[in-house]
Each structure stands twice: as structure tokens, then as C-alpha cells.
Swiss-Prot record:
Its main location: cytoplasm. It is found in: Cytoplasm. Gene3D superfamilies: Globins. It holds the Pfam family Globin. GO terms for molecular function: heme binding; iron ion binding; oxygen binding; oxygen carrier activity. This is Globin-like protein. One of its GO terms (cellular component) is cytoplasm. Belongs to the globin family. InterPro entries: Globin, Globin-like_sf, Globin/Proto, Globin_nematode, Mb-like_M. It comes from Caenorhabditis briggsae. The gene is glb-1.
Length: 160
């Protein structure tokens, strides 16, 4: 089933209703919870978090660093979901995200892989249905496509 940009945006935004950012305990827990899920289910990717390579979910839960990082990642997901219908703004945000992450020398395949991780987190908390997951993966495909173009144009490693 093919979806329009508006349908994708609406479904992604809806899936985030229970995962709001904010300074409340729940808002902070929403973001930190993503990293607890991430560190538990994708331990091989902890290498990208200097100083936290050996962290467990329990370490993440108690970490102010991941409280803050969780807010940043959730905010980023809210932003890309909410601007998806504005293709130029969406692409500009993708490029800016790449620029901010250059210093980490990430495997370029991880840009698409993120959406598998993120939808897995949403599923694990009961915040995602099949249609919303398909929408996130469609958004992720577009996100990744712009990532790879920008990486190539920046003379950085990219997925061919």
C-alpha cells in the first residue's frame, strides 16, 4: 500500500502522542526509555557512545546524559514527523543531522537502521500499530535517501 506524504506524516505524528518530550518525569522517561531499549537490544552500537560502551539499561536509566540525549532523539523524531510534508525543510533537517554527526564517523548504513530501532522501541511500549510502523519505515527510507546523497556530496562514506 502506497501512502501520501500527508498520510505518512499523520501516522508518524499519531504514533508519538504517548512519547512526548518534556521536563516532566514521563517526558524524560520517554526519551531515556529509548536508550534503555537501544542499549539492551543493540549492544554492538554502544561503541558510538564514548564512555558508555559498557552501559546496561539500568546504567542508562540512572544517567543524566541519557535523559538529555533521550530528549534530543525524541525531539528529532517529532520534528521529522511534523515537517515531513514540507519536503525541502525535511531534507534540510536531514542534512543538518548528518553535519552534526560527522564527528562520530558512523557507518552510513546506520541511518536507515535507526528506523528499525526506533519502531522497535515504539512497538515495545505498545505505542505503534502496523500502519504506523509502515509509515515510519517509509519516512525512514526518504530520510536515508537524503542522508546518502548528502554524504556522497560531502565526500564521506555512503551506501551506494
Amino acid at each position: 500500500m502506497s501512502m501520501t506524504r500527508q498520510e505518512i506524516q499523520d501516522l508518524c505524528v499519531k504514533s508519538l502522542e504517548e512519547k512526548m518530550v518534556g521536563t516532566t518525569d514521563k517526558g524524560i522517561a520517554n526519551g531515556n526509555g529509548f536508550y534503555q531499549y537501544f542499549f539492551t537490544n543493540f549492544p554492538d552500537l554502544r561503541v558510538y557512545f564514548k564512555g558508555a560502551e559498557k552501559f546496561t539499561a539500568e546504567d542508562v536509566k540512572k544517567s543524566e546524559r541519557f535523559d538529555k540525549q533521550g530528549q534530543r532523539i525524541l525531539l528529532a523524531c517529532h520534528l521529522i514527523a511534523n515537517v515531513f510534508t514540507n519536503e525541502e525543510v525535511f531534507k534540510a533537517y536531514v542534512r543538518e543531522t548528518i553535519n552534526r554527526h560527522r564527528i562520530y564517523k558512523m557507518d552510513p548504513a546506520l541511518w536507515m537502521a535507526f528506523f528499525t530501532v526506533f519502531t522497535g522501541y515504539l512497538e515495545s511500549t505498545g505505542s505503534l500499530n502496523d500502519q504506523q510502523k509502515a509509515a515510519w519505515m517509509a519516512l525512514g527510507k526518504e530520510f536515508n535517501a537524503e542522508c546518502q546523497v548528502h554524504l556522497k556530496n560531502s565526500n564521506l562514506p555512503y551506501v551506494h
